[in-house]
From Swiss-Prot:
EC number, UniProt record: 3.6.4.13
Gene designation: RH10
Subcellular location: Nucleus; Nucleus, Nucleolus
Gene Ontology MF, one: RNA binding
Knockout-associated phenotype: Thermosensitive dwarf mutant. Reduced plant height, root length and crown root number at 30, 32.5 and 35 degrees Celsius, whereas they grow similarly to wild-type at 25 degrees Celsius except for a slightly reduced plant height. At tillering stage, plants grown in a hot climate show narrowed leaf blades mainly due to a decrease in vascular bundle and lateral vein numbers, and all internodes are shortened.
Ranges where the Helicase C-terminal domain occurs: 256-416
Induction per the UniProt record: By high temperature and the circadian clock. Expression peaks at zeitgeber time 9 (ZT9) corresponding to afternoon of a subjective day, the hottest time of daily temperature fluctuation.
Protein name: DEAD-box ATP-dependent RNA helicase 10
Enzyme class: hydrolase
Task of the protein: Has ATP-dependent RNA helicase activity in vitro. Acts as a thermosensitive RNA chaperone required for normal processing of pre-rRNA intermediates. Required for normal cell division at high temperatures. Required for a primary metabolism adaptation to high temperatures to support thermotolerant growth by regulating gene expression. Partially rescues the yeast rRNA helicase RRP3 mutant which has repressed cell proliferation at 38 degrees Celsius.
Family from the record: Belongs to the DEAD box helicase family. DDX47/RRP3 subfamily.
Length: 472
């Protein structure tokens, strides 16, 4: 039994902690990984086999990131891992490569060899895509289990006995409970990605039940951008003598990210937003708002102003969420308006700017939001629109980061000249939402049909362009 079996785990069900705990050497406490004398410059130097080195090269991974360089050797030795790294640091590769390499060592690769849990559907699909890309040349099969997708189709996929299962806790538990012939009783690897989010109350029961039915003798990788108290307690409960690899401070942003904020009156926030967008023509931009309704309203308003904007939120069906993401990734639309459903783990290449239209009440969400840009060593820009009611939340963000974010001034005349046109566009957007059944209960039949709205949304004649030359 674990040496510290009397550890209090307030946030976790005590029975689950007991069920999840595995025999742990040295009390199950993590060991800090010793940094290598020289950071390996190739995947081959890390011990990755040639087949996977070739797969990395095909994906454009020329050299390992810092977290990959520090985590992969320990994972290849069969150690449990705690990996802490900033968003965009390459955490997926850090656990996917060792799992695939362990599978390659088997004479007959085992079905249902590894399971990866993700807090969001989009991140689950992204992880699945990376597994398939890395394993494409060696016949790796992967199934993604998330809500919003037909369960019968997923059951058919599970019947084919994939090597890897990636899913959200709720849908995975549905299949463990209801899908005949499916179990994880021979599972060799469990990965908890974005672990701090997985420990939220909305996932707790499903996660508890999953931990109760999988083998205790397994390798467990726990990855997160932040190390919270809950993550620390989970680590003591279900990892065996883990190695801790940390490539970031507890809450931090990358050095290549430039951050600023505007202090704006609440009634003029839309005007400041349009001002910022006009300063960034052609940029790939993610705008974060607080509610699902706000994503739709803001997308319609901006489209009425001739911006190429699309929204994504938790109220959309899975097909439409993926469709919106694909339109953004392919640059069909260069502005993605989203709730915090898009702040975790999504690896969208080329995001230049993150705009916090609504300031998050949870300071840690700010770190995840701005982590959508300045990824993999690239530069990025994050700007926040802070009104008088959000100033306290923004101060809490600065306290968490440990530094003050510089403010940016703007000529009020430039803002005021935008007000009338934006008001017209917003009024038209509100009318469109009302006529289309803007409230959640009325919208079920044609839920979040962005393309239909884009075709039918009326456009004010006054709002043809907001280029600077038009304003003067």
């Amino acid at each position: 039994m674990a040496k510290k079996k009397d550890v209090e785990v307030e946030e976790l069900d005590e029975e689950v902690v007991a069920a999840a705990a595995a025999p742990a050497a040295d009390g199950g406490e993590e060991q800090e990984a010793e940094p290598p004398a020289r950071r390996p410059s190739t995947f081959a130097e890390l011990g990755v086999v040639p087949e996977l080195v070739a797969a990395c090269d095909a994906m454009g991974w020329k050299e390992p990131t810092r977290i990959q360089a520090e985590a992969i050797p320990h994972a290849l030795e069969g150690r449990d891992l705690i990996g802490l790294g900033q968003t965009g640091s390459g955490k997926t590769g850090a656990f996917a490569l060792p799992i695939i390499q362990a599978l390659l060592k088997q004479d007959k690769p085992q079905a249902l060899f590894a399971c990866v849990l993700s807090p969001t559907r989009e991140l689950a699909f992204q992880i699945g895509q990376q597994f398939e890309a890395l394993g494409s040349a060696i016949g790796l099969s992967c199934t993604v289990l998330v809500g919003g997708v037909d369960r019968v189709q997923q059951a058919v996929s599970l019947a084919k006995r994939p090597h890897i299962v990636v899913g959200t806790p709720g849908r995975l538990l549905d299949h463990l409970t209801d899908t005949k012939g499916f179990s994880l009783n021979k599972l060799k690897y469990l990965v908890l990605d974005e672990a701090d989010k997985l420990l939220n109350v909305e996932f707790q029961k499903a996660l508890d039940d999953i931990l109760n039915v999988i083998p205790k003798e397994r390798r467990t990788f726990l990855f997160s951008a932040t190390m919270t108290n809950k993550v620390s307690k989970l680590q003591r409960a279900c990892l065996r003598n883990p190695v801790k690899v940390e490539v970031a401070s507890k809450y931090s942003t990358v050095d290549t990210l430039r951050q600023e904020f505007y202090f704006v009156p609440a009634d003029y926030k839309d005007c400041f937003l349009v001002h910022v967008l006009n300063e960034l023509p052609g940029s790939m931009i993610m705008i974060f708002v607080r509610t699902c309704e706000s994503t739709r309203l803001l997308a319609l308003t901006l489209r009425n102003l001739r911006f190429k904007a699309i929204s994504i939120s938790g109220q959309m069906s899975q097909d439409k969420r993926l469709g919106a993401l694909n339109r953004f990734k392919t640059k069909d639309c260069n502005i993605l308006i989203c709730t915090d459903v898009a702040s975790r783990g999504l690896d969208i290449q080329g995001v230049d700017v993150v705009i916090n239209y609504d300031i998050p009440m949870n300071s840690k969400d700010y770190v995840h939001r701005v982590g959508r840009t300045a990824r993999a060593g690239n530069t990025g820009y994050a700007v926040s629109l802070v009104n008088q009611y959000e100033a306290m939340w923004f101060k809490m963000i600065e306290k968490l980061l440990g530094y003050e974010i510089p403010d940016r001034k703007v000529d009020n005349a430039e803002i005021m000249i935008l007000r009338e046109r934006i008001s017209d566009s917003k009024r038209i957007a509100l009318t469109t939402m009302k006529e289309g059944g803007g409230h959640k209960k009325k919208r079920r039949k044609n839920e979040d049909d962005e393309e239909e709205e884009e075709r039918n949304a009326p456009v004010s004649r006054k709002s043809k362009s907001f280029n600077k030359s038009r304003r003067r």
